[in-house]
C-alpha cells in the first residue's frame, strides 16, 4: 500500500505542477517531484515484477500445459529479479536526514601534536578541497589561523553544492595520523591528530535570536591568515549569552560582517539543537554509524604502511596516497553510507 501511496503523491504533484502559475509553488513542487521520481520508477518496476510473478504462478496452477510452459520460462527470471528490487526499494524508503542536501560549515582544527598536527590539518583541508572540486562543490574560506611551521591551527570554510552534508557529515570527529615528520632526524614515527567538525547550513534556518541574548563587539579587521585589511574597527564578534557561543566575521564591511556573523550564529545554534535531538534518540541511533560527535575517533592515517583505517566500520584500505589527495575519499564515504544503510535496514527488519 505504501508504494501506491508514493505513486499517487507523485502523480498529484505532477498534476499540480501543470495547474499552478505560482513561482514559489512551482519551485517547491519541482523539488518534491525530483525527490520522488527515483522512488516511483523503482516502485513501478517492483510492482510490475510482482504482478508478473503472480500471473505466472496463476498460469502454472491453471492446469493449461501450454500456458504453464510459457509461465515457467518467465518465472525464474522474475524470482531472480524480485529480491534485488525489494532491497533497492527498501533503501529508497529509508527515512532521510532532512539536512542531507544542505550546505555545510567545515571546521578543521589541529589537535595534539604541535606543528605536525597543524601540518596534518592542512593535509585534511586540501583533501576536502580536492574532493569538493571532484563533486562540483564550491569552497569559501571564512577564517584561518596558520600553523607556525605550515598547515593550520584552525581553518573554517563554507562548502556549497548538491548534497554536501549527506556526504561530508561522515568526516566529523578526530582524525589521527601516524608518520615520520620532516623534522624528525631519527626516523621515528610520531602520532598527532586533528579534529573535523561538519555543521549543516540549510537555507532559511528558522531560529529566532533575541536581541537581549546577544552581545556584539567590533574590533580591528584582519583577513585570512592574519593579513591586515584596513585600519577601521570593521570586524564583528557576536556572543550568544545563553550558550556562550561566539562567532566572528572579518570582511571589510561592518554591515556585511554583522550579517555573516549572525548567519554563523544561527548555524551553530541549529547544530546545537540538532545534537540535542540526536541525543534524545540515542537508542535509535545505536544502529547507525558514529554519532557525528567531534570527540569521536573516526579514522587513522598511517603513512609508512600507506594505510587508512576507519574505526567506525572496520574499513582498512591500502591506498592512503590516493585518499589524502581527495581522489579516492569518495570510496571511503560510499563505504560508510552503504554500511549505514545496511545497519538501518537490519534494524527495521528486526522491528527496532
From Swiss-Prot:
Annotated GO MF terms: translation release factor activity, codon specific
Which keywords, in A-to-Z order, does the entry hold? Cytoplasm, Methylation, Protein biosynthesis
Q: Which SUPFAM superfamilies match?
A: Release factor (SSF75620)
Superkingdom classification of source: Bacteria
Region (Disordered) residue spans: 277-303
**Processing after translation:** Methylated by PrmC. Methylation increases the termination efficiency of RF1.
GO cellular-component terms in the record?
Answer: cytoplasm
Residue ranges the record marks as coiled coil: none
Q: One Pfam family name from the record?
A: PCRF
**Where is it chiefly localized?**
cytoplasm
Q: Where in the cell is it found?
A: Cytoplasm
Instruction: Tell me where in this chain the PTM N5-methylglutamine is found.
Output: 227
Function as written in the Swiss-Prot or TrEMBL entry: Peptide chain release factor 1 directs the termination of translation in response to the peptide chain termination codons UAG and UAA.
Q: Which family does it belong to?
A: Belongs to the prokaryotic/mitochondrial release factor family.
Q: Under which name does UniProt file this protein?
A: Peptide chain release factor 1
Organism of origin is Hyphomonas neptunium (strain ATCC 15444)
Q: What's the name of its gene?
A: prfA
Amino acid at each position: 500500500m505504501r508504494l501506491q501511496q508514493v505513486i499517487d503523491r507523485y502523480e498529484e504533484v505532477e498534476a499540480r505542477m501543470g495547474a499552478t502559475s505560482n513561482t514559489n509553488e512551482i519551485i517547491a513542487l519541482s523539488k518534491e517531484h525530483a525527490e520522488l521520481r527515483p522512488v516511483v520508477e523503482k516502485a513501478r518496476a517492483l510492482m510490475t515484477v510482482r504482478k508478473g510473478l503472480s500471473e505466472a504462478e496463476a498460469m502454472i496452477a491453471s492446469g493449461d500445459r501450454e500456458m504453464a510452459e510459457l509461465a515457467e520460462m518467465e518465472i525464474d527470471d522474475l524470482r531472480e529479479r524480485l529480491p534485488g528490487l525489494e532491497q533497492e526499494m527498501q533503501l529508497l524508503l529509508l527515512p532521510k536526514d532532512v539536512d542531507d542536501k544542505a550546505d555545510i560549515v567545515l571546521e578543521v582544527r589541529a589537535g595534539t601534536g604541535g606543528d605536525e598536527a597543524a601540518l596534518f590539518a592542512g593535509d585534511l583541508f586540501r583533501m576536502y578541497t580536492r574532493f569538493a572540486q571532484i563533486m562540483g562543490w564550491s569552497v569559501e574560506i571564512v577564517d584561518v589561523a596558520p600553523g607556525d611551521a605550515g598547515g593550520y591551527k584552525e581553518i573554517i570554510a563554507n562548502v556549497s553544492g548538491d548534497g554536501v552534508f549527506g556526504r561530508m557529515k561522515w568526516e566529523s570527529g578526530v582524525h589521527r595520523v601516524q608518520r615520520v615528520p620532516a623534522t624528525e632526524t631519527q626516523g621515528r614515527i610520531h602520532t598527532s591528530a586533528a579534529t573535523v567538525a561538519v555543521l549543516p547550513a540549510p537555507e532559511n534556518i528558522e531560529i529566532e535570536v533575541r536581541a537581549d541574548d546577544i552581545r556584539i563587539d567590533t574590533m580591528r579587521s584582519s583577513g585570512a591568515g592574519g593579513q591586515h585589511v584596513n585600519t577601521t574597527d570593521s570586524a564583528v564578534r557576536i556572543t550568544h549569552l545563553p550558550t556562550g557561543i561566539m562567532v566572528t566575521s572579518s570582511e571589510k564591511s561592518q554591515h556585511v560582517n554583522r550579517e555573516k556573523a549572525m548567519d554563523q550564529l544561527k548555524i551553530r545554534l541549529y547544530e546545537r539543537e540538532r545534537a540535542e535531538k540526536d541525543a534524545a534518540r540515542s537508542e535509535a541511533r545505536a544502529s547507525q554509524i558514529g554519532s557525528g560527535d567531534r570527540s569521536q575517533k573516526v579514522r587513522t592515517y598511517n603513512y609508512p604502511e600507506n594505510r587508512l583505517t576507519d574505526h567506525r566500520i572496520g574499513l582498512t584500505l591500502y591506498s592512503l596516497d590516493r585518499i589524502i589527495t581527495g581522489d579516492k575519499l569518495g570510496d571511503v564515504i560510499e563505504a560508510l553510507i552503504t554500511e549505514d544503510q545496511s545497519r538501518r535496514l537490519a534494524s527495521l527488519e528486526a522491528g527496532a
